[in-house]
Structures are given as structure tokens and as C-alpha cells.
């Protein structure tokens, strides 16, 4: 099941990301229409289907960087194959709406931080956006927020040796939310049930 839009918005509000939050969208995301609101969370499915997989994005105008954080670290081709979703189209739309010279540097996640059967993608996306809000020039690594999770190469994310790392990532993320989101704490049992490490069978 994963996270709902309402849950993500409430958690992001607790994390003080709301001032930067463009919104939550399905795969029809129109692009970055406001430089003052550079952080959307986008689902790979149409909203009427109930959603599939959350991806966080962030636009940093000072250096025309477009950050795309997929907790699985899938390539554009893999996202197209699995979810019929392409971020290159989003990148083109974003360049048209947000950059004077229409030149955007794509910086995407290539490692996996989420377990293969986990439904925690929305929460990991929220963690990334909090990292961006506090460290917009360096949201992917090298700061105390995002460094609580450790990536493994995408091609090895189903290996037995990777699973303890990915499980620890999810536990660290939960602990972060326990310390920083009253909404998460008050709904912890239900959120953990819906985003469990072994939710997808």
C-alpha cells in the first residue's frame, strides 16, 4: 500500500519542508512551475489507480540542478519497463518552465536505499526532501540527514548480502521520523504496517 498523499504532506509539514513543497503529484506532473516551490513528490502511476511508487524531486536554480531521488535507484529505462514512467520527459518540461537557457543538469540516484519488498518509498522521498531543504547544494550525501541511509548498487539490491543494509536503512528512517514528526508518532503503527520492509510479497 505505501504512503498516502495526506500522510506525506503531514510528515513533510512536521519536517518543515512545506514552504518548499510544490505538491504531491501522479505521473502527470506538469514540471517545476515555481522556483519558490522546488520540491515535488511524484508517483509513477495515475492517481486514480491508487499509486505505485513515489519518487522525490528537487530543483536547485543556482546551478540549474534537477535532483531525482528514486529509493530504488532505477534507470529511466528500468522505470519505463516496470512502471511505464519516464523522468526524461519531466526533465524536458522542467527545463522549459524553470530555466532561462533551458539547460538542466540531471543528478539522479543510482544506488538503492529501499528493500526490494519494502513499501517505504514515500517516506524515503520525504527524508530526501528534508535533506534538500537543509542542504540544497548537497542533498544526496555528506550531510547528517541523508547519511543515515546507505546505498547499495541497484544491480545488487536483491542480493542476500544487501538486505541487512537496506533493512537498517528503513529502521534508521523510522527512527528519524519518530524524533522529528509528531504525525508519524501518532500514526506509527498504521504507517509502519503499510510501509513495511516485507510488505510486497
Curated annotation (Swiss-Prot):
Gene Ontology cellular-component terms for this entry are:
host cell nucleus; virion component
Return the broad EC class: hydrolase
Which EC numbers characterise this protein's activity in its record? Answer: 3.4.22.39
Keyword terms: Autocatalytic cleavage, Disulfide bond, DNA-binding, Host nucleus, Hydrolase, Late protein, Protease, Thiol protease, Virion
Query: Which protein, by its recorded name, is this?
Result: Protease
Task: Show the SUPFAM superfamilies listed in the entry.
Answer: Cysteine proteinases (SSF54001)
Matching HAMAP family: ADV_PRO
Record-annotated active site: 53, 70, 121
Which lineage do the record's taxonomy fields give for this organism?
Viruses, Varidnaviria, Bamfordvirae, Preplasmiviricota, Tectiliviricetes
**Regulation (activators, inhibitors):** Requires DNA and protease cofactor for maximal activation. Inside nascent virions, becomes partially activated by binding to the viral DNA, allowing it to cleave the cofactor that binds to the protease and fully activates it. Actin, like the viral protease cofactor, seems to act as a cofactor in the cleavage of cytokeratin 18 and of actin itself.
Listed Gene3D superfamilies: Adenoviral Proteinase, Chain A (3.40.395.10)
Q: Which organism is it from?
A: Equine adenovirus B serotype 2
Biological processes, Gene Ontology terms: proteolysis
Protein task: Cleaves viral precursor proteins (pTP, pIIIa, pVI, pVII, pVIII, and pX) inside newly assembled particles giving rise to mature virions. Protease complexed to its cofactor slides along the viral DNA to specifically locate and cleave the viral precursors. Mature virions have a weakened organization compared to the unmature virions, thereby facilitating subsequent uncoating. Without maturation, the particle lacks infectivity and is unable to uncoat. Late in adenovirus infection, in the cytoplasm, may participate in the cytoskeleton destruction. Cleaves host cell cytoskeletal keratins K7 and K18.
Oligomer status and interactors:
Interacts with protease cofactor pVI-C; this interaction is necessary for protease activation.
GO MF terms here are:
cysteine-type endopeptidase activity; DNA binding
Protein family per UniProt: Belongs to the peptidase C5 family.
Give the site residues for Cleavage.
50-51
Q: Where is this gene product found?
A: Virion; Host nucleus
- Asked if the Swiss-Prot or TrEMBL record annotates the protein with the keyword Protein biosynthesis, the reply is no
What triggers expression? Expressed in the late phase of the viral replicative cycle.
The extra comment attached to this record reads:
All late proteins expressed from the major late promoter are produced by alternative splicing and alternative polyadenylation of the same gene giving rise to non-overlapping ORFs. A leader sequence is present in the N-terminus of all these mRNAs and is recognized by the viral shutoff protein to provide expression although conventional translation via ribosome scanning from the cap has been shut off in the host cell.
Record's catalysed reaction(s): Cleaves proteins of the adenovirus and its host cell at two consensus sites: -Yaa-Xaa-Gly-Gly-|-Xaa- and -Yaa-Xaa-Gly-Xaa-|-Gly- (in which Yaa is Met, Ile or Leu, and Xaa is any amino acid)
Keyword Metal-binding in the entry? The reply is no
Amino acid at each position: 500500500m505505501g504512503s498516502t498523499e495526506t500522510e506525506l504532506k503531514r510528515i513533510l509539514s512536521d519536517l518543515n519542508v512545506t514552504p518548499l513543497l510544490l505538491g504531491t503529484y501522479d505521473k502527470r506532473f506538469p514540471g517545476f512551475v515555481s522556483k519558490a516551490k522546488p520540491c515535488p513528490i511524484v508517483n509513477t502511476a495515475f492517481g486514480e489507480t491508487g499509486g505505485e511508487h513515489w519518487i522525490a524531486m528537487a530543483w536547485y536554480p543556482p546551478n540549474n540542478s534537477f535532483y531525482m531521488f528514486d529509493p530504488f535507484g532505477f534507470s529511466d529505462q528500468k522505470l519505463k519497463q516496470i512502471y511505464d514512467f519516464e523522468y526524461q520527459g519531466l526533465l524536458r518540461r522542467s527545463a522549459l518552465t524553470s530555466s532561462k537557457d533551458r539547460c538542466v543538469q540531471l543528478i539522479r540516484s543510482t544506488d538503492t536505499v529501499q528493500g526490494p519488498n519494502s513499501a517505504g518509498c514515500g517516506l524515503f522521498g520525504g527524508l530526501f526532501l528534508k535533506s534538500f531543504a537543509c542542504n540544497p547544494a548537497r542533498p544526496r550525501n555528506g550531510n547528517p540527514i541523508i547519511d543515515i541511509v546507505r546505498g547499495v548498487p541497484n544491480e545488487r539490491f536483491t542480493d542476500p548480502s544487501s538486505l541487512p543494509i537496506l533493512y537498517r536503512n528503513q529502521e534508521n528512517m523510522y527512527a528519524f521520523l519518530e524524533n522529528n514528526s509528531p504525525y508519524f508518532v501518532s500514526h506509527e503503527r498504521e504507517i509502519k504496517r503499510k510501509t513495511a520492509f516485507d510488505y510486497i510479497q
